[in-house]
Amino acid sequence: MFGASGKGLILPECRVFPPSSGISMRITMIGSGYVGLVSGACFADFGHQVICVDKDAEKIEKLELGQMPIYEPGLAELVTNNARHGRLSFTTDLKGSVQGADAVFIAVGTPSRRGDGHADLSYVYAAAREVAEAVNKFMVVITKSTVPVGTGDEVERVMRKTRPDGDFAVVSNPEFLREGAAIRDFKHPDRIVIGTSDARAKAVMQDVYRPLYLNRAPIMVTERRTAELIKYAANAFLATKITFINEVADLAEKVGANVQDVARGIGLDNRIGAKFLHAGPGYGGSCFPKDTLALIKTAQDHQAPLRIVETVAAVNEQRKRAMGRKVLAAAGGDLRDKTVAVLGLTFKPNTDDMRDAPSIPLITALQDMGARVVAYDPEGMEQARLVLNDVTYAADAYACAKGADVLVITTEWEQFRALDFAALKAAMTTPVLVDLRNVYSPEEADRHGFAYTGIGRG
């Protein structure tokens, strides 16, 4: 359980997920984007009564019809099932949804602020003001959005200024969901971090997470500022790990080593671990680029610069731009009037998220070199059309490869792991494969008559 002190208590993990305890909380989730919708649907699946709020009336209408604003495996079924059973509903009425709630989660966007890289917290503070106006009993207000250290203090200040008589506690509860595996991550977490020193808030959070608590999921209760820093530090560390193995991959190419074997050799060390040691075109997505930049700015603001993280962010941006030069070299040094087929657009598989995807600077670089780009992605092409110009989109991998001079694998979707090389070769003008995810081995590509370029294979 949470314990009297409420600090640093971690429970051992158990993988069997128990049925709900029967304690149903009234939860309001402000923000029906990726974090809010996944979290709200999972809380409803625990047996809680959940209302997801969003100012976007069209999004709410579509959710009520069972239409998802994002692609996440299993989410549509989870939302539909819990809505059908009356545990999950959607509204644009923030005030009405907050009144009577036991816990209100703020899960709105915190994009990088234009010009300086700080997190834009205007949506968080606006939500806090509206929640304060609606408070009509003791309420726990939880920041689920990824926010810089000290944001919880400011949320509380904003709320107290709006409602000096309001009875509420502000808690930090950062999310650690991976796109493409978010539902499993929520229900089988590595840890749950709760940032509060308020005894009543601890009791409410224990009831909110009771199914996981009964399942002995690791729960850590700490101070609010510490919880906020844990989230940023975790993402920065993972970004560092990715960037490290990418730089080792560059060295491996120069010295005649194999980065995949290097990664396995160091990953078998329990002190290091194998996760996030997969060399590729650089990290992207909605979290790592934004959060590392926000952490860098926070550290600079407090005269405690994080030089390692600064370097990681800079190296990652350089790497994404450098992938175009790798394709250029594979094509013989000239891409003018050549066709490049790009398989995979999203920043990772099992999502439709194009935010900061490595494919964006890659395709832009290829176009700058004079190439025509044809692309295919199982889920990301609708979003890609919003951020990429002058790209032709294909119906499948083989239509994408038709007439191509070079084929580039940018995202390791499962369907790209078993491509028919004979069909690809027959479709292409020249059989050149640039594998930015090391899906295939050079030997396999060579066996099928392809000139192969991978990552970190000297």
Regions found by a protein language model. Give the residues of each.
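Structural/interface elements that position substrates and couple domains in central-metabolism enzymes
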Residues: G22-G458
